[in-house]
Amino acid sequence: MDSVYIFPRKKFDQQVREITLEHCMMKTVLVIGGGGREHAIVDALSRSPQVGKIYCAPGNAGIAELAECVPLKELQIAELKEFAIAHEVDLTVVGPEVPLSAGIADEFRTAGLRIFGPSAAAARIEASKDFAKALMARHNIPTAAYRTFSDFDAAWEYVRAGKFPVVLKYDGLAAGKGVVIPETPAEAEQALKDMLLDECFGKGKVVVEEFLTGPEFSFMCFVDGLVVTPMVLSQDHKRAFEGDKGPNTGGMGAYSPVPIIPQEDIDFALEHILKPVAAAMVAEGCPFQGVLYGGLMKTPDGPKVIEFNCRFGDPETEVVLPRLLTDIYDVFSAVADGTPMPELSWSPEVTMGFVMASKGYPGSYQKGFPIVLPEIAAVRVYHMGTKCEEGVLKTAGGRVLMVVGSGKTLQEAHDLALETVRNIQCDNLFYRSDIGWRVL
């Protein structure tokens, strides 16, 4: 008879207990959203040794490779809350601004659920340009001079008597497309008609701002009340076409860091813009808890605020989070729980990403075009608007993919990403090849 090794029962029981304990300690996370930003968040969470299960609602074809996608839309707040309860979700992370402004964080917290994201009251810093401008005016935070109008005739009279170019901003949420910079009175009149008479973004007000000059940069911070923890800088490319031409979009590419912004401007922005606005929101009874995004401009008079967002930027997140070495679950938990923030550690490698968008974007466009991705090793491909039908990857949004390269230099990151972009096969995508032109 062959000899049989009998595993010692005591040792076996101990190993079972250790495995079971480790499994029980693994966290379940729900990410809300279905774009490239959420793909980058899921990607970062998947690298956490603490996270065992990730759900994403609704997700996309790329996210489905890392998480279980849930067929719930971002504004199905009651259903998302019930899902989190039923599936014993330890932490929910909200990507888009729309559910935040609709109060999803308030609903979850009232139900005793842990969530990363600001209250509806705090989300007004993005959901209402007029609220943000008035807050900055009350607390002496540097920004462009402005006036707010709800009446077309009053707005047109004010604008035509002023200087051009001028900046016109729809007061509410407009998916990053509610800003127009007319260079002539005729362009301004048409834009005001579109916003105030035709209500192209819905009924609302228009903020008229002075036109500032200088390079823009994105400064995102993790904020928990008065605790403001900065991330590395990035720079977005808003215009649709090369040479910074065409209409504004949600963003056609980004890179990180931003060498044209000196450390003294970063320090000024943190001490005189980001920290003061966080303190202002605490003072006014709507403390911020989540990611505060400062869209800033380096003007001849120093950094000034162009806009605030109440969440991770998109496409900035796709070039910032790949550089984060700290366990992002610890970061999200610290903000959600009001506990001490871990020290953030960043990779010295730099990143640059190119957005591939459907032809016609940011206007009308067609969906459902097949996409063939090349063998990918040295770059990250974040899905922004994709779906998988019968095993075929297809376009499903305005912005479809973001290809992010990393390297020791921005030129190296640029070249790696652009090579992959040029090898992606799809009949209905366009991209800007000049991402990073200010620093290359």
Residue ranges with predicted function:
Residues 118-178:
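A conserved helix-loop-beta module that forms one wall/lid of the active-site cleft
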Residues 178-315:
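Internal nucleotide-binding/catalytic subdomain
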Residues 333-440:
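Peripheral (often C-terminal) accessory segments that flank ATP-dependent C-N-forming ligase machineries
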